[in-house]
Amino acid sequence: MKCKTRWEKKFDCFGREDGNILLLFAGSLTVLIFFIGISMDLGLIYLKRNALKNLCQLVKEDRFTFQDSIRYSNNPGKDSFTMIEDAIRRNHFDGTVKVYFKEDIPETNYRYYKIRTQLSEEYSYTFLKIFGADTTTITVYFDGGETYGEGISDVIWHPALPVSSYNGSYTSQPDGSFGYDSADLPADW
């Protein structure tokens, strides 16, 4: 009869595992890589979304530069879109720019309009492509507007066109033109 040494007795329990620890290690490593990959994609989406928000903030800060140009424009919806899109494109944005413009029917001493700028860009997944997900659209927007005219004696300039001719959405097209839809306004307006 063979007598086992003390060390052989201690490691004898590992001989009965038949690779279970190895399988457990491989499985947990696979799960860990999966969660790291998903975290990486979500982190990159978050970074892209923050970059779009920064562009929105840039245009929002420029609104005082554009304010009089919009105020005295014959077509303030189209001119708002043109100015906003130019500012966005100068900052190397290649996605879709959509500007919603809505002005209330002006009175002789009062004028109010709202502008919503919406930026959309495609994000191509890095890790989730393994599971068949290719792209997702990241969209951010910000609202702005202006009210002017306070007193009864204020005289406010208005465009000759009725507000229904320039209220709506203006969407950039890949060829550099834009599309106009008078019925497309945000639901929460």
Model-derived regions, located:
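Alpha-helical assembly-interface signal, strongest on the long, hydrophobic N-terminal helix that forms
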Residues: K2-F81
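Short, conserved structural patches
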Residues: K2-C3, W7, S69-W189
